[in-house]
Amino acid sequence: MICVNLPRLCTAIVTSFASSTDTAAVKMTLIVCNSFFKDRLMEILKENGIDYFTSWDNAKGKGRGTRPHRGSGAYPSTTSVTMIAFDDEAPLEALIRSIDEANREIQRPEDHIRLFQLPLERIV
């Protein structure tokens, strides 16, 4: 479960785009990875010129086909969640290619970096 401070979240989204953004093409991504791979994800974002994001560290959860990430006991690892809004498909597609490439280097499929893409209805 991810708990979000909505006013802070909305501020982060709004400051990423001008108010005239055509939201028809805007996509929201949630990138989820084992916290161990957070530094690699930040390298990928930098390599792709993406310097706008909101990130939550030490998130807890369990993905389909993965072990739990609870931050204690038998499951000491945690998850990192990074949210990015894109108003252009090109950097998003480049990011997806980079994540696919990084995942080929990560030996265990359960540790792969996951990107979830969603339509973003409106930015106010």
What label would you give each PLM region?
Residues 1-124:
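Positively charged, small/polar-rich N-terminal and surface patches that mediate targeting and assembly
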